[in-house]
Amino acid sequence: MSDTIVIVDAGRTAIGTFGGALSALQATDIGTTVLKALIERTGIAPEQVSEVILGQVLTAGCGQNPARQTTLMAGLPHTVPAMTINKVCGSGLKAVHLAMQAVACGDAEIVIAGGQESMSQSSHVLPRSREGQRMGDWPMKDTMIVDGLWDAFNQCHMGVTAENIAKKYAFTREAQDAFAAASQQKAEAAIQSGRFADEIIPVSIPQRKGDPLVFDTDEFPRPGTTAETLGRLRPAFDKQGTVTAGNASGINDGAAMVVVMKESKAKELGLTPMARLVAFSSAGVDPAIMGTGPIPASTDCLKKAGWAPADLDLVEANEAFAAQAMSVNQEMGWDLSKVNVNGGAIAIGHPIGASGARVLVTLLYEMQKRDAKKGLATLCIGGGQGVALAVERL
């Protein structure tokens, strides 16, 4: 790579709950807010953008290429191409990797990458409807479950894969609830202190009467959560299990994006890089324990960067489930005081196509606040994969 690849700006929406503040908006509406804001505040001429690459997992019934829709809705000219990708929970981070590759290869100068998702607006579908059903029940399928939360290989919910990890590592219910409570408490403290304010781009939501609602605060965290309150919840996937709605991530809506270019281009445009993109890795694992994906992905990413876990100043590791996140922390052996310092997806939420970019955006802003040098963003992926991205502040 002859010229350093950098991120010059990053932003995300506040994360909405399932059926919550953002539920009336399509994923493209949510993404448009972020894309438009990044163009405006960087001062980049819309026609200068080489491509827009966005992750979105739940696209059934959303129309052709949602990333393209978002691009044009944000006011970019029709000459700017766009691509929607689906790597399930890793989509938003893989989009950034694709941007990194395109810029490094000289195929693009400026790429805006990230993800968008409305789990609230995901469709129900009627399989085999073109053939018809002569007799019997004809059940619809929930695409949010089938396309987003279901293991196609073992025919089970993602929560069952978390149960598999809990059993493999002998993680108790109490330990998982304590982990989840800590995530909630860190997120609550971060929100109360305005820690996320810089990274959040407000969304204006039209109302039937009066002024639009301005949504600018994550609504999924549950203030006052303790391990004791979580301990009252029933297991969600196995009656004898340990995984509950309280020690798992949420079903959420949101969008997050970053602006990628070469350092020389940033200098030409008078933009100050937030960080350089150092290394990326994807890895595959047994789908039955898909949550362990960040272990080989992070290990390989650090190897490419020439770093050790101890070199990291901050880590954002997506919390799909407490058991899953605990397994990653245990195997990576990194300093837990540097991991998800403002809470993770158990508290903040997990809008699947956007989460990869969300953890990266949060990482970048927290690195600025702490004057941190080296950071890592990583996520597990349904179907048995992991992704990781190493960044360094210049």
UniProtKB/Swiss-Prot annotation:
GO biological process, any: poly-hydroxybutyrate biosynthetic process
Cellular component aspect of the GO annotation: cytoplasm
Localization: Cytoplasm
Keywords, ordered alphabetically: Acyltransferase, Cytoplasm, PHB biosynthesis, Transferase
Presence of the UniProt keyword Acyltransferase in the record: yes
Classification via Pfam families: Thiolase_C, Thiolase_N
Keyword hit for Acyltransferase: yes
EC numbers: 2.3.1.9
Entry's Gene Ontology molecular function annotations: acetyl-CoA C-acetyltransferase activity
Reaction catalysis annotation: 2 acetyl-CoA = acetoacetyl-CoA + CoA
Active site per database record: 89, 350, 380
Origin superkingdom: Bacteria
UniProt pathway: Biopolymer metabolism; poly-(R)-3-hydroxybutanoate biosynthesis; Metabolic intermediate biosynthesis; (R)-mevalonate biosynthesis; (R)-mevalonate from acetyl-CoA: step 1/3
PANTHER family: ACETYL-COA ACETYLTRANSFERASE, CYTOSOLIC, ACETYL-COA C-ACYLTRANSFERASE
Subunit structure: Homotetramer.
NCBIfam families per UniProt: AcCoA-C-Actrans
Family: Belongs to the thiolase-like superfamily. Thiolase family.
Name used for this protein in its record: Acetyl-CoA acetyltransferase
Encoding gene (name): phaA
